[in-house]
UniProtKB/Swiss-Prot annotation:
Pfam families, per database record: Complex1_49kDa (PF00346)
Subunit organization: NDH-1 is composed of 14 different subunits. Subunits NuoB, C, D, E, F, and G constitute the peripheral sector of the complex.
Family statement: Belongs to the complex I 49 kDa subunit family.
Cell inner membrane as UniProt keyword: yes
Example of a GO cellular component annotation carried by this entry: plasma membrane
Keyword Magnesium: no
Species, as recorded: Anaeromyxobacter sp. (strain Fw109-5)
Reaction catalysis annotation: a quinone + NADH + 5 H(+)(in) = a quinol + NAD(+) + 4 H(+)(out)
Its membrane topology: Peripheral membrane protein
Main localisation: membrane
Protein name: NADH-quinone oxidoreductase subunit D 1
Amino acid sequence: MEKLILRRVDRNNEEMVLNFGPQHPSTHGVINFIVETDGEVMKRAIPDVGYLHRSIEKIGEVTGYPGFMPFTDRIDYVAAMFANEGYAIAVEKLLKVEVPPRAQWLRAISGELVRIASHLIAVGTMTMDIGAFTPMVHGLREREEINDYIEALCGARLTYNYHRIGGVAFDLPEGWRDKVLAFLDRFDKFLPEFDRLITFNEIYKKRLANVATISREQAISYGLVGPNLRGSGVDWDIRRDLPYGAYPNFQFEVPVGKGWAGTVGDCFDRYYVRCLEMKESSRIVRQALETIGQTPEDIMAKVPRNVKPEAGEVLSRVESARGEMAYYVVSDGTNKAYRLRSRTGSFTAMSIIEDISGGLMVADLVALISSLDVVAPEIDR
């Protein structure tokens, strides 16, 4: 990287080295890209991360097990519910605690609503980044209503701290179920409207089709997860293939990229996989709300006040909005983790940018970053 930055550029050609960031509206956080260009064509774009590093993992090792839960909200502030859940499951495995069925249903309901809200931000900002502002406003309108319901459930709109080791903090408020079902009725009509507005727009499709294609082999090799992996044609979803919580009780499809507008694995496929996932998340929430009344009322397992798991190690994996989120926790028998490691989808997504950016137009870098749906705190932690 130093050679790239310090090399003297020949004034007789159009080569330039640009800093794209670290404070740029299209980078979706404090991220920098060192872009080597030849005219309007990129030779490569190198991610330069670390601006938002906060020692989250070390904090998890010096904070008691329950005390670390609010910090997990800061790993992915756009969809914090999954960071809560992944950590809770890891500690529950160490304690050998069985979570009550109702709490598992509540985790699925809150998680899938947050997945919809996160994808609305992803597809909305993607359209805005390439020049279409109206779809972003439509997405924010729907997201704000979801945030209202999440706030009524747990008291927060962004950093939820809803999960507890052994269950969840609150049950459904009175009337909440009927309001969410009514919202889903409207939302299911909104998705076709959104498709008519932007998805099937010829200009939009041409802007994303055959751009920054990630092959199936590349996606697997770089360890991509979630919509980025499925957008490349890999049929893999933790909720279905390694089911956890209440997910074995629900019927849903896993959208996979098919080259809808161009090549399998291009920007459009990654975009449209997220659109289809919102439909499936709505379907899961419906099923959960219709059956949660059949579960016992307990929302918390019996967990000791001073959490001191036996010595051992566990790995938990959940399907977040950005793909597989994993926690590796090592216990030494005390009330603090000896080692805590989190794995997120945004970090692996960043790693592939240098490999696939060569030959793209400079303007396509914005489309590429948006299609990967990276969130800066997930990268640096």
